[in-house]
Amino acid sequence: MATILDDRSVNLELVTIYEISKILGSSLDLSKTLREVLNVLSAHLETKRVLLSLMQDSGELQLVSAIGLSYEEFQSGRYRVGEGITGKIFQTETPIVVRDLAQEPLFLARTSPRQSQDGEVISFVGVPIKAAREMLGVLCVFRDGQSPSRSVDHEVRLLTMVANLIGQTVRLYRSVAAERQQLQEEKRQLSRQLQGKYKLDNVIGISKAMQEVFAQVHQSAPSRSTMLLRGESGTGKEVIARAIHYLSPRKDGPFIKVNCAALSETLLESELFGHEKGAFTGAQGERKGRFELAHGGTLFLDEIGEISPAFQAKLLRVLQEREFERVGGSRSIKVDVRLVTATNRDLEKAVAKGEFRADLYYRINVVSIFIPPLRERREDIPYLVEHFLEKFRVENQRAMVAMSPQAMKVMMNCYWPGNVRELENCVERTATMMRGDLITEVHFSCQQNKCLTKVLHEPGQQQPVVVVPLERISAPYGAIFAEWDGQGQATGAAPPTSERERLIWAMEQCGWVQAKAARALNISPRQMGYALQKFNIEVKKF
């Protein structure tokens, strides 16, 4: 008879462990998982009261899941280490068996009466929950009377095995939760860094054309409107797109970029909309598209003028309905995405030729911003050159590299078909290949007929913009900050004549922002910094 009971107990243990193992590996919802585990234990052990307590950051054991408790009993399930039977199990890290709770002085009766309503004895079995030698909590079972079908030793053994499985799951869950929290914090820090990197204050452009671009960006960024950025390749459309995102209410959401020209029609559809498992050869699992990934943020479609007419129709539907289906799927997915597009093509001509759908053109051309080519804002070139030289110095840990006036004249007279991107490459290439710390005109590839721009575009007759020395700044600059009388006349006074006073005046007018004061004085930020040091002018902090 004992052998039969032992066999039944072993079979019960195997079945119970198997079912609980499946539950623990089926979900990342810890609360739901633990509840299902306790339900299995309650059914297999034929008991109505099962409790699971875990150690909290407060240093207390707290009930996190239970079967057979009232709300009041559940809320009272808190124990200090060593307090009551539960606290004692945690403290000693050993199981405790109580055959009659009415006779046990350690029992506090917070989660169970000492006797059943009909006076029947209530017994108790509790085991510690451990993982990698770390105490995590306590698993307890209450029973009215004694079980006729199994011994207490069998129950202790079963509960210990279950507690070990629970401990491993809890430890893994907490590890994943900690990593997720760390990733979220890193994401927030990266987002703050990107916001600083791509804010408009860091976009170089003192020219009137770029100031107009900045004004349009500030005006349109807070809205939900679809935007179209237009300009030649290399003018900085992506930088402006990111600035729009980080100036908008969606700045804490994702910024997702897709280069439409780099993907075929089939790949572009899968990339934007995602795909279901088995949608095509090689689709081993479902995959979210860029529209889903950009939910709550901004989707930047670069080179939108290069997409095929067939795909234009699919994109139009998404823009109209704000929903789509994954490739190979039938379920509609709704998204909240702000769309920013960019192109270097003449879309109006493309529409006239039938190469671009007119209805899609009207959808994306809600707010249009034109980014001027570098040759139309040559006054920005000295500041861009200085910025790229400083970037090169920091990235390569080099000494300060300067550019001679003759070298700057070459830069100012270049056609720059590749715009800012080409300018940056030219500065980096020249600074890398030169010897010494001063770039002269002989260091440039174009002076050796090794530059494609020199071959394709002969220098024009445009006069370079002269950087006015500080001492030559005269009264008209005072009008930049002067009060206006509404008739187009400045009423403010001209800046002071002394160089030190002029520096202080410019800094005061610009709120002690060095970059703004430098632009007002038509000098570079580096020159501004040198001048402030030279005259021992302390920069005020606000």
Swiss-Prot record:
Limits of the GAF domain: 29-170
DNA-binding region: 514-533
UniProt-recorded Gene Ontology molecular function terms: ATP binding; ATP hydrolysis activity; DNA-binding transcription factor activity; metal ion binding; sequence-specific DNA binding
Classification via InterPro entries: AAA+_ATPase (IPR003593), GAF (IPR003018), GAF-like_dom_sf (IPR029016), Homeodomain-like_sf (IPR009057), HTH_Fis (IPR002197), Nif-specific_regulatory_prot (IPR010113), P-loop_NTPase (IPR027417), Sigma_54_int (IPR002078)
PROSITE patterns with a match to the protein in the record: SIGMA54_INTERACT_1, SIGMA54_INTERACT_2, SIGMA54_INTERACT_3, SIGMA54_INTERACT_4
Record keywords: Activator, ATP-binding, DNA-binding, Metal-binding, Nitrogen fixation, Nucleotide-binding, Transcription, Transcription regulation, Two-component regulatory system
List of residues binding a divalent metal cation: C446, C451
Region Inter-domain linker, annotated ranges: 433-499
Binding site for ATP: 231-238, 294-303
Pfam families reported for this sequence: GAF, HTH_8, Sigma54_activat
GO biological process: nitrogen fixation; phosphorelay signal transduction system; positive regulation of DNA-templated transcription
UniProt keyword annotation of ATP-binding present: yes
NCBIfam families tied to this protein: nifA
Record's subunit section: Interacts with sigma-54.
Function: Required for activation of most nif operons, which are directly involved in nitrogen fixation.
Name the UniProt record assigns to this protein: Nif-specific regulatory protein
